[in-house]
Amino acid sequence: MARLVVVALLVLLSLSGLEAIQHAPKIQVYSRHPAENGKPNFLNCYVSGFHPSDIEVDLLKNGKKIEKVEHSDLSFSKDWSFYLLYYTEFTPNDKDEYACRVSHVTFPAPKTVKWDRNM
């Protein structure tokens, strides 16, 4: 019984230690297909390598939050960092600007990364 208690305490201590580690997310904004004006496409925001898991991600059109956005389930890598994919349908043109805004404990303020149609 004592051995079980010791093992349980070690597991709890190791898990609580993971919460102390913080890694800033890497943010990548890209379209599923090469951008063509007037042709429907998908805008993707891939956020990876972050810890802890609490994160807020918004896709933006001309600085305003896009409401109809879907996302993958929160997943983790071998190093226990997390990753997510947020995406929405959009139709590129020359007048609209698209971006991904991410809020995470490792950022002093939300970070916004613009979509570059040439990437």
Curated annotation (Swiss-Prot):
The protein, known as: Beta-2-microglobulin
What's any one GO cellular component for it? Answer: extracellular region
Annotated signal peptide: 1-20
Keyword flag Secreted: yes
Disulfide bond positions = 45-100
Q: Key word Signal present in the record?
A: yes
Q: Where is the Ig-like C1-type domain?
A: 25-114
The family this protein is said to belong to: Belongs to the beta-2-microglobulin family.
Record gene name: B2M
* Keywords of this entry: Disulfide bond, Immunity, Immunoglobulin domain, MHC I, Secreted, Signal
Q: Which SMART domains match?
A: IGc1
Function description: Component of the class I major histocompatibility complex (MHC). Involved in the presentation of peptide antigens to the immune system.
InterPro entries per the UniProt record, alphabetical = B2Microglobulin, Ig-like_dom, Ig-like_dom_sf, Ig-like_fold, Ig/MHC_CS, Ig_C1-set, MHC/Immunoglobulin
